Amino acid sequence: MQAKAVVRTVRIAPRKVRLVVDLIRGKQVGEAIAILNHTPKTASPVVEKVLKSAIANAEHNYEMDINNLVVEKVFVDEGPTLKRFRPRAMGRASQINKRTSHITVVVSEKKEG
């Protein structure tokens, strides 16, 4: 059985979130939360919140045991990009892309054996 949680349109670039997400893939949920608490990245609290939401979904909706949960899948997709302009020299302007992310966390019970 799997439980998942998704957060959409987070104002952090997907490239930066993937650095954090790669640290917890395949880990037990307790270990994953500990890793996120000690990771000094802006995306860490956001990923931790999604992970806790997935754990709560597993417990409430599917009555899974929290102690046996493992982060099965976690991935980051690109959300809509906010396009902004920065004034430059001689009356020109450069485009600034403010990227957003969709973060998905899937937890499942650890298989015995």
UniProtKB/Swiss-Prot annotation:
Question: May I have one GO cellular component term?
Answer: cytosolic large ribosomal subunit
Q: Which Gene Ontology terms describe the biological processes this protein takes part in?
A: translation
Entry keyword annotation includes Transferase? no
Keyword annotations: Ribonucleoprotein, Ribosomal protein, RNA-binding, rRNA-binding
Q: Which InterPro entries match?
A: Ribosomal_uL22, Ribosomal_uL22_bac/chlpt-type, Ribosomal_uL22_bac/org-type, Ribosomal_uL22_CS, Ribosomal_uL22_sf
Superkingdom to which the source organism belongs: Bacteria
Q: Tell me, what's a Pfam family for it? A: Ribosomal_L22
Could you cite one Gene Ontology molecular function of this protein? structural constituent of ribosome
This molecule's function is given as: This protein binds specifically to 23S rRNA; its binding is stimulated by other ribosomal proteins, e.g. L4, L17, and L20. It is important during the early stages of 50S assembly. It makes multiple contacts with different domains of the 23S rRNA in the assembled 50S subunit and ribosome. The globular domain of the protein is located near the polypeptide exit tunnel on the outside of the subunit, while an extended beta-hairpin is found that lines the wall of the exit tunnel in the center of the 70S ribosome.
Stated family: Belongs to the universal ribosomal protein uL22 family.
Oligomeric and partner information? Part of the 50S ribosomal subunit.
**What is the name of this protein?**
Large ribosomal subunit protein uL22
Q: Which gene encodes it?
A: rplV
